[in-house]
């Protein structure tokens, strides 16, 4: 089928009649069409549910491994939810690694099968152009779009790629107050994500799309025993080292399963409708073969489509690139050329052949599907949900020049700059930092910067620069409201923070902001 035939088919055969009428009127660009489109979207916005995707790192059911003997079920919550809600197998484009490619399929509806061998679109085409995606499509219906990831922002280039996928905000580990809650391998635990997801929902009046990428289940899994007195024990593997790897893995995904319970419990009482799709991005890096698995398939995990408003339960197996279209279809959303295509053509003749042609047209061709012009503008994505603010300075000790830096939304990745130079900083809590060893002058200028956890350690965002004389608690330049909210703290709290952080954030020479 030619590209133009696909476009005609999308308009005339595979769209709902109402949608086809809207497309035809839009092509004529009549004034009346704009009014109809606005009215249609206003109707769509009413009572639209929040749509959440939770991509669980290396999460799958280890009881599917033939040779393992596991002392207890590592994922009782996920298994229970699979029985109670829509669920099935989730076909993914990767095994053992390749998180970003499962992510790409789930966000865009495009199949990695039609890219080059070993290609990561995040490292190729998406560095050059925007791309139709669930965030872009839902933004047109009044949704706010958020990404959440408890790892560094620059991993897989997400900080620069997500604006090309239509995200409004990105909360990475650098913007999480609990980013230092680590597992034995140093990955931030997934339990910190519950509050971050709720923050996204609370930050807007309208519906939200939140795509969350977890990290706790990440390898490489240790061959020695790292967990003392593990809750779950594992035997049956060929070597003791492999038993240790599986035992570590099972205990980590058990904690992830507890996080799933905590999150669904929190969302069950949320005052808005919520759909939450949860799935593993790929099998863990354990050298598994087809013969090792009861389901005989390596490129497959499982998903649950949970909700808090009583959707009909369905048992259906899906590919990652089909899931967003399925969710939209379940709630009556028929927008976006790729997603409408899946809704209309899945399980029909030439489905894959035409999908390949459609993807080529959208990413590499002349974009006939969009009348020759890419309609998606790169978003002005903000890092974090809320601004970092610098509100006041408290003198703790004049002897060793110790100060409290007070404000809002600090994290362990916050670092103070004085007159443009990095300064050693100790994180206390989301409203308090400590600096010590330098006497501040009234006219010194301070800011609090969120620094990347990547090797570059570049600045990502910062508070406004403010002069010391305007920040001191007794300054005549401070507003009355700022004075009344100042908290002098205690030396005991300072000592505790310094003991908890014996290694201060290092000062890096010749660093430059990347604003």
PLM feature spans:
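Membrane-interface segments at or immediately adjacent to transmembrane helices
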Residues: 1-55
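Solvent-exposed soluble domains appended to multi-pass membrane proteins
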Residues: 37-48, 56, 61-435, 439-515
């Amino acid at each position: 089928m030619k590209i133009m035939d696909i476009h005609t088919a999308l308009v005339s055969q595979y769209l709902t009649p109402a949608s086809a009428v809207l497309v035809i009127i839009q092509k004529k660009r009549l004034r009346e069409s704009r009014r109809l489109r606005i009215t249609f979207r206003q109707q769509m916005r009413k009572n639209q549910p929040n749509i959440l995707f939770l991509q669980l790192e290396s999460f799958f059911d280890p009881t599917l491994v033939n040779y393992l003997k596991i002392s207890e079920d590592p994922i009782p919550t996920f298994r229970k939810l699979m029985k109670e809600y829509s669920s099935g197998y989730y076909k993914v484009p990767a095994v053992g690694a390749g998180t970003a490619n499962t992510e790409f399929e789930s966000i865009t509806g495009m199949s990695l099968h039609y890219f080059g061998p070993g290609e990561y679109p995040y490292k190729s085409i998406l560095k050059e152009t925007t791309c139709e995606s669930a965030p872009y499509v839902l933004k047109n219906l009044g949704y706010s779009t958020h990404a959440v990831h408890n790892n560094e922002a620059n991993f897989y280039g997400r900080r620069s790629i997500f604006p090309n996928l239509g995200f409004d905000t990105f909360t990475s580990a650098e913007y999480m107050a609990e980013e230092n809650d680590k597992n034995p391998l140093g990955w931030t635990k997934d339990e910190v994500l519950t509050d971050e997801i709720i923050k996204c929902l609370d930050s807007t009046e309208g519906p939200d799309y939140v795509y969350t990428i977890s990290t706790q289940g990440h390898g490489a899994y240790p061959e020695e025993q790292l967990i003392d007195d593990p809750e779950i024990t594992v035997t049956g593997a060929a070597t003791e080292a492999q038993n240790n790897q599986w035992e570590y893995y099972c205990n980590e995904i058990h904690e992830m399963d507890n996080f799933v319970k905590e999150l669904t419990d929190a969302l069950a009482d949320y005052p808005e409708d919520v759909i939450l799709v949860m799935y593993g991005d790929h099998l863990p890096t354990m050298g598994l073969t087809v013969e090792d698995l009861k389901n005989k398939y390596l490129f497959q995990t499982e998903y649950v489509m949970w909700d808090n408003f009583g959707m009909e339960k369905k048992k259906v197996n899906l590919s990652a690139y089909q899931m967003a279209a399925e969710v939209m279809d379940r709630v009556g959303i028929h927008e976006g050329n790729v997603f409408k295509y899946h809704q209309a053509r899945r399980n029909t003749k030439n489905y894959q052949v035409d999908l390949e042609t459609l993807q080529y047209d959208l990413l590499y061709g002349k974009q006939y599907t969009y009348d020759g012009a890419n309609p998606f503008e790169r978003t002005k994505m903000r890092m974090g949900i809320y601004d970092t603010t610098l509100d006041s300075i408290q003198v703790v000790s004049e002897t060793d020049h110790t100060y409290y830096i007070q404000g809002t939304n600090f994290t362990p990745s916050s670092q103070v700059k004085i007159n443009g130079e990095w300064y050693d900083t100790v994180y206390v809590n989301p409203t308090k930092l400590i600096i010590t060893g330098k006497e501040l002058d009234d006219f010194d200028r301070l800011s609090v910067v969120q620094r990347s956890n990547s090797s570059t350690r570049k600045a990502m965002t910062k508070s406004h620069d403010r002069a010391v004389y305007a920040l001191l608690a007794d300054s005549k330049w401070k507003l009355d409201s700022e004075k009344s909210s100042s908290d002098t703290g205690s030396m005991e709290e300072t000592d505790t923070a310094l003991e908890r952080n014996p290694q201060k954030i290092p000062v890096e020479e010749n660093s430059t902001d990347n604003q």
